[in-house]
Amino acid sequence: MSILHVTILTVFPEMFPGTLGYSLAGQALHNNIWSYNIINIRDFGLTKHKNVDDKAYGGGDGLIMRPDVLGNAIENALSLNHNAKIYYPSPRGCVFTQSFAKEMLKNKNLIFLCGRYEGIDERVIAEYNVTEVSVGDYILSGGEIPTLTILDCLIRLLPGVLINQNTLSSESFEKDGEFQGGLECDLYTRPKIWRGRAVPSILLSGNHRLINNWRKEQSHMITKLRRPELLKDL
C-alpha cells in the first residue's frame, strides 16, 4: 500500500497538523498511512524582515505573494516530494467534491500552497502548472483551513483508515454507493422515543427490503429538497 505524502507551504506552520492530528486522520498519521512535512514560506522571505509579499502591479487593494519567494519555496518542496501535484486553495478554482477527491488520490504525492493576503502572483500558477481548488463560494483569510478540509476528506478515503471500508458506500455524494450520489438519509439511534419524538417504525420492523427502500426514498426526497442539482447526475 502506497503512503500519501503531503507537503504544505504556509506562513503559519503552527496551524498543522491541527485537526488532522486527531480522530481518524490522527490515527492514520500514527499508523503511517499518510505523512506530511511543512515548509515555512517565510524561510525564503526577503530582507531581514522575511517579507513574502508586495504591492500589486496595476493598483488594487491588498498585497500579493511574490513569485521569487514562492518559487524558491516550491523548488524546496519538490526536492522533498518528487513528482508531486501542486494544489492552491482559491475561490477561483474548481469546486472540491467527493469525485475531485478521488481524482486527487491518483497521485500519492501532493503539495498544498496556502496563500495569504490578496493571493499569489499568477506566474507561479503558470510556471508550476498549479491546480486551483475551491471549497465553496465564500472567502477565507488564507489557504490553511481549506487545506485541512481537503486533506481530511482525502485521508478518510485511504485504505485502512476506516475500520469498515463499506461505510463509504452509504455516505452522501458517493455515486457508486447506496444513495447514488445523493444526500444521506435521516439517521436514528437509541432511545426509541426521545422528547415525544419516535424513531420511524419501519426502522424497527426488521424487514431489510422495506428499510432499504425507505432509506433510498428518504435520500431522494432530501436531495430534491436541499440539493436538487445533484439529481441531474443520477
Swiss-Prot record:
EC code: 2.1.1.228
Keyword Kinase part of the UniProt annotation: no
Residues given in the record as S-adenosyl-L-methionine binding sites: 115, 135-140
Signal peptide limits: none
Biological process per Gene Ontology, one example term: tRNA N1-guanine methylation
SUPFAM superfamilies: alpha/beta knot
Superkingdom, natural source: Bacteria
EC class of the enzyme, as a word: transferase
Compartments where found: Cytoplasm
Catalyzed chemical reaction(s): guanosine(37) in tRNA + S-adenosyl-L-methionine = N(1)-methylguanosine(37) in tRNA + S-adenosyl-L-homocysteine + H(+)
Single GO molecular function: tRNA (guanine(37)-N1)-methyltransferase activity
This protein's UniProt keywords: Cytoplasm, Methyltransferase, S-adenosyl-L-methionine, Transferase, tRNA processing
Primary subcellular site in the record, as a coarse category: cytoplasm
Family: Belongs to the RNA methyltransferase TrmD family.
HAMAP family for the chain: TrmD (MF_00605)
Role noted for this protein: Specifically methylates guanosine-37 in various tRNAs.
Subunit structure: Homodimer.
Name under which the protein is recorded: tRNA (guanine-N(1)-)-methyltransferase
UniProt organism field: Rickettsia prowazekii (strain Madrid E)
Lineage of source species: Bacteria, Pseudomonadati, Pseudomonadota, Alphaproteobacteria, Rickettsiales
Recorded name of the encoding gene: trmD
